[in-house]
Amino acid sequence: MEEKFKYSLRISWSYFLFLKQRIIHDRLTVSAGYMAYITLLSLVPLVTVLLSVLSQFPIFSGAGETVQEFVIQNFVPAASDAVEGSLKEFISNTGKMTAVGSGFLFVASVMLISAIDRSLNYIWRVKKKRRPMYSFSLYWMILTLGPLLVWASLAATSYVTSLNIMDDEIVSSFYRTLLGWLPIILSFSAFLGLYLLVPNKKIRVRHALVGAMSAGCLFEVSKVGFAQYITQFPSYEVIYGALAAVPILFVWIYLCWIIVLIGAEITASLGESDQWLIDKINTHVFDAENTVLTESKGLTESDSTDPKSK
């Protein structure tokens, strides 16, 4: 039993060392900064396109505002009045644009999804690109089905709330608990779909589940931590005043992308077990605290019996 525990511990240590080196190699923080910048430029166009898709269906009249309020309340922690007001103002201003401007909005939103596609495929070391028609179909599916699924879940929630069965105290308590888990379920589903569908290679479901669960937990913890920071240390609003919405939103988007990419790194590294399993690696690499996996090759060569190595 003790030997199995030690072996599991060494396996875990080997994996975390490999994951650390992988994250450093992929320059995760730099990629997250790039994605945050692209997202900040494409956020309003993307939301506008999503809301315009909903507005094309009479049954979804008024759904845009419902989805917008739900996203701001549950996925932007402690959104100050400045952030919420600025987002709504930016989105409302797009209604004054011409057809040409609307076309540019669509292009900007596709550019964001394309950037996500490139970043995740780089993490999975995918060099083969998808066919243009397949990529366009995938992007179009995200732009159309995404808001419809969110609205459908919110509509189902509203319908259940209106039922007489909700008058029962036990059922009502259970429903409120379930409703509280809805944002977590949606974020986990989004991470899972992202890690399964975007990479242009076959991903094992259990690896994607671990990555999505890790990213989901980090996301929920980050929401609480970021909300506490914004409310307890409102330095951005003191320094920037009315412009505080921009840096606050950028920092949160940057943090979100770090979480997304960490989840992707976890999912991808689980599929590369041949590089971190203890049986495949020189075990004395774990004796030193600051030793990294790449040093094991040098240690092996120095101990070689090959005359050329001496």
Swiss-Prot record:
Domain of life: Bacteria
Topology with respect to the bilayer: Multi-pass membrane protein
Entry's localization field: Cell inner membrane
Keyword Cell inner membrane appears in the UniProt entry: yes
Keywords recorded for this protein, A-Z: Cell inner membrane, Cell membrane, Membrane, Transmembrane, Transmembrane helix
Pfam annotation, one family: Virul_fac_BrkB
GO cellular component: plasma membrane
TM ranges: 34-54, 97-117, 136-156, 178-198, 207-227, 242-262
Keyword Transmembrane helix among UniProt keywords: yes
InterPro entries found in the cross-reference section: UPF0761_bac, Virul_fac_BrkB
Family matches, as HAMAP family: UPF0761
Family: Belongs to the UPF0761 family.
Name listed for the protein in its UniProt record: UPF0761 membrane protein VSAL_I2938
